[in-house]
């Protein structure tokens, strides 16, 4: 009986080995086991063989036998006849094999599916399982976390709904912006940039069309777009040579160790393509996300952007419509607890508003403001300070403060301007400027232009065409009085500037005779023309300080002289001798230069009676800075003599254009001429 059982199993194994060779694609494990099978091992284990302990190899072989019915019928015909007892045992074996086959079918299917997936990952990169994309945990505009609306497009940005509404980027009535349900039942929402296939370069911040101007980073979880030229400038960017330009942006590589950040704890800057490993992070980095979920891909601000203004706030200021209705303002003033006291105005007062162009509009007063004032109008004194601070308020950058003083002064202080112009009192008129500058409680229904009475001509900021276009000012009554007194006082100019006719005549000589050094002369005139305004201001400062102490009186003038001196001494090594008073025909001979120069100086001496500037003998060996200091001292001596004469004469001259550059040019040309180096030359120089 045992012998028949052994022969039956051996025959079944041989048949199953033949079936395995034909069906290798269905089950790889069975083919491997069939090759390693030996009948000798089976004969050795016959003594310990039992019907219940069937090996996994036999189970797999029987499974293959059931799949091919034809071969199983052939195997039954080829099997030797067996007794009734052996047939019963074979039936028991077949029943047990069928029960075990049902349990192993599921395991084989799972193994085959896993193997198929592994094979697909190795062959095709596009079929790899990709990690789910995560949106940024910070609002794109305000750079703060909170309840965010996440875009399902390519950009992976997140927004506050309030930030979208403030920038007119969210319109629920628009079909392109409202959430859309897909076929699967999922809800998707995309921002305007993803809908219109536009975005901005993360490097240069310039907008472009996706796919034409801008290219997206190849990394699946990255939503940054770049110009191809901008990415090529970064050494950390990994460019991939394929048919289409693809790249990995610098956000995926540490800027310190220049190693990829995949699988490591890293953070990247929210404003520029800079990333760090947490270990390599530099001091001064500001963390924007501190939660556990965003710890591996944290958002920071690198040290380049610490202290900078948010660029989206800057765009909001310039792109804002500036149309503030009274309804929204009344809601804000009613809900928020502000320190500004409420105004109670009679029914006869005018109500108005100011638009961006500076025009004043009037509307009918509401019925809620017909109460009488509890404070006498003679005691109420008002002043409005409109402070424009670009760093504090993101909406309008205006802080309206109401103060009580003795006069109505409207001061609009701007951080960028320091000009001041006064606005005089207009309390006696029927206009109440406090109300149209402050928040009103009703919208404008029928705006009409206010008629403003004309102010006296002495007021510099009032005019018949006054439209409440308040310029930034820091007004003070005492400063206004001082300014008026300064305008009425006569302007006193030092004596060396008085003879303007001599200057004009000398300029004609320069224009006719200065042909050899036109380039030098043009450079001096250009440098002088750039500083005309500063020179005129210096004249006013000198005239206002004539009756004061002499210390530091001409400091601004000396600074300008030093600038001209340094510019002129830089060209001292030129081959052509510098002499603006010599003609081209006389430039070849040194004697003709000396005669022309001395004749021009004699003409100037005949026209002016000024004192001379004493030049020391060691002037030629001095450094440029020492020469300027020497020139300052000599000019100081001359200025003191001129001031003493002015106190006696008290000359009054109208302000005219000052040509200080020519005086300095004349002096340095004289120092470079041969007359200055000759022994017969008197070491003195007389300016015009």
Curated annotation (Swiss-Prot):
Residues 16-39, 65-133, 310-339, 381-406, 526-554, 578-605 are annotated as: Disordered. GO terms for biological process: chromatin remodeling. SUPFAM superfamilies: FYVE/PHD zinc finger. A zinc finger (PHD-type) spans 136-197, 198-260, 261-287. Keywords: Coiled coil, Metal-binding, Repeat, Zinc, Zinc-finger. The keyword Disulfide bond does not apply. Residues 627-654 form a coiled coil. It holds the Pfam family PHD-1st_NSD. One of its GO terms (molecular function) is zinc ion binding. Residues 16-38, 74-86, 93-112, 326-339, 526-550 have a biased composition (Low complexity). PANTHER family: PHD FINGER-CONTAINING PROTEIN DDB_G0268158. This is PHD finger-containing protein DDB_G0268158.
